Amino acid sequence: MEAHSLPNVLNVISNEKALAIFKTIAETKGDSGVLRTKLSITRKQYYSRISGLLTAGLVKRTNRKYSLTVLGELVYDAVMTLENAFNNNNYWKLKAIDSFEVPPRELSRDERKKIIDTLLKDDRKIRDILIAKVES
């Protein structure tokens, strides 16, 4: 598997500890000692997960501090969007929207957009993604 590929990136962040390290780096611009202590993981776990994040091109190290690469920032944004889809009852709202997936003759685009807008009024990003899909 190529190091800089979608399957590799997904494989790296599918590990809970690696994902926690990745998110902590994004949120704190943390120094390596603080990261390990904050996450309560062993030295071996930490370096193993950091190695995967570095190889996948998601993080970089400068002066003992880790930060996200541009690719890492894109992946972080996608991860946060997905996490938000599972939080704040959004999952059930998305399931409700799925239940309205009927043939276009039964539910117009405007009606679909209105349902999405109403259910996801508090989450603009997910709402905008779904409305763009309806409009395409």
Model-assigned labels for residue ranges:
Residues 21, 33-39:
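A short acidic, leucine-rich amphipathic alpha-helix
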Residues 16, 27-31:
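Short capping segments at the starts of secondary-structure elements
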Residues 19-23, 74:
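Pre-recognition alpha-helix immediately N-terminal to the DNA-recognition helix
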Residues 37-55:
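Short amphipathic alpha-helical interaction segments
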